[in-house]
Amino acid sequence: MKTYIQLLLAALFIPVLSACEQEDDVIDIFTGKTWYMTYIAVEGQNKMYDFWQNDQDAREKSFKTITGDNYTLVFEGANVNDVAIGTFSGKATSASVNGDWSANGDNRELKITIKNGGGTDGDKYLGKAFMDGLKSAFKYGGDNKNLYI
């Protein structure tokens, strides 16, 4: 019986001893893939924000632009002193952008510095929101399958 209790206690403590760190693997999350925008939402919601103010024709026209290489981001980088840093490039529909980025896995702080591009996009709704979102990004969430900026 004593051996059984010892084995049970050992089995219960193994997960505690091998618990994962709470810090994100930022390089795994951001790099090695092309990120495609699926929607732009208000924080805490998972549906597309109504940039079109109920203008269904404008909405449909914008949604048709979410194809191919439109609304994409590619991050390259490395981990330096526990902070991921690198370069990025992105594209809305007609406007392209590139620059530097850094992210902290402890507090999920994100800094994006646009060096080139980031101007007016052909789609005045989603394209504008995509570019404005990059300019004002300060935090990220997600994992290596979903990225929220």
For each predicted feature, which ranges?
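Lipid interaction determinants
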Residues: 20-149
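C-terminal motif of bacterial Sec signal peptides marking the signal peptidase cleavage site
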Residues: 15-19
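N-terminal hydrophobic targeting signals that begin at the initiator methionine
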Residues: 1-2, 21
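Sec-dependent signal peptide recognition
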Residues: 2-10
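Intrinsic disorder/low-complexity segments
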Residues: 11-12, 138
